[in-house]
Amino acid sequence: MALIELRHVKKEFSGKAGKVTALKDIDLTVESGDIYGIIGYSGAGKSTLVRLLNGLETPTEGEVEIQGQDIALLPNKELRNFRKKIGMIFQHFNLLWSRTVLENIMLPLEIAGVPKQNRKSRAEELIKLVGLEGRETAYPSQLSGGQKQRVGIARALANNPDILLCDEATSALDPQTTDEVLELLLKINQELNLTVVLITHEMHVIRKICNRVAVMEYGEIVEEGKVIDIFKKPQTEIAKRFIQQEADKNIEETELVVEEMLEQYPNGKIVRLLFHGEQAKLPIISHIVQEYQVEVSIIQGNIQQTKQGAVGSLYIQLLGEEQNILAAIEGLRKLRVETEVIGNE
């Protein structure tokens, strides 16, 4: 069931030089209980989109519908109550430095008028959920970055929200702490059936826990789909760049090696293999060597784990009789391994 739906959303801001269009014709659907990623570089429109989702901005055109309500049409009082069902965490934590961990988590409940004893018991539950037992009386200055973000997550969950918006929530963290926070978000999603929307510029974050992703550029969603499908076959240049940064960090070196091997072995073929799921577990190289009497030189490869399974790419050179090479390529395709001849065709 769709929990969030954006239909033909446009957002303009007025400036000295005239109107600036931050979002153009955005269509987006997030299912209840999903972990949905939105990725883009700075200026793509991600932050504006977040502000539309929590009702801090209204669209110039189009509809932002959450739980069946067009939130732009809600009166102020109803909008304030509605916002209680949306939690949010940020890159820079936004904790009150004069309050302890427990007091920071109690803050939204205090604002909502929840009795003090109920506030305390709820905060203690959340401290246990996010793994901060024993740090209840610590102040933010005494916490690591990862612990501060855990406090931020607990505070965002205080009012039992249905949606958690994460705006660059791991950007200020080191890689290990990032993974720990992502694992916590995955745990919360599974245990509470909480819908999570992740805004990020890091493909690692998307790969690690998201089911679907929207790729944004210049205020538009240029590509959208299951994470594993985007990794398998990105359709846009920006999606390809994100995936290359994450999965193929030595792509320039690969291209140079391919050029050198094309010169050294003009009769062979350079082939890029892309495989996923069960194909990633198959002994593909030994199979084609034995079955088709070809020689295989491995240039470079990698396997990336997504939430929906492994995605691997491998650059190889096939050497041998022409008919054997062509048969090997056809055999790979029959195994449902996506095969692209990139040299010596």
From Swiss-Prot:
Coiled coil: none annotated. Belongs to the ABC transporter superfamily. Methionine importer (TC 3.A.1.24) family. It is a peripheral membrane protein. Keywords: Amino-acid transport, ATP-binding, Cell membrane, Membrane, Nucleotide-binding, Translocase, Transport. GO terms for molecular function: ABC-type D-methionine transporter activity; ATP binding; ATP hydrolysis activity. Pfam families: ABC_tran, NIL. The lineage of its organism: Bacteria, Bacillati, Bacillota, Bacilli, Lactobacillales. It catalyses: L-methionine(out) + ATP + H2O = L-methionine(in) + ADP + phosphate + H(+); D-methionine(out) + ATP + H2O = D-methionine(in) + ADP + phosphate + H(+). Gene3D superfamilies: 3.30.70.260, P-loop containing nucleotide triphosphate hydrolases. The complex is composed of two ATP-binding proteins (MetN), two transmembrane proteins (MetI) and a solute-binding protein (MetQ). InterPro entries: AAA+_ATPase, ABC_transporter-like_ATP-bd, ABC_transporter-like_CS, ACT-like_dom_sf, MetN_ABC, MetN_ABC_transporter-like, NIL_domain, P-loop_NTPase. GO terms for cellular component: plasma membrane. This is Methionine import ATP-binding protein MetN 2. Its EC number is 7.4.2.11. The keyword Plastid does not apply. Part of the ABC transporter complex MetNIQ involved in methionine import. Responsible for energy coupling to the transport system. Transmembrane segments: none annotated. It is found in: Cell membrane. ATP binds at residues 40-47. It comes from the Bacteria. Residues 4-243 form the ABC transporter domain.
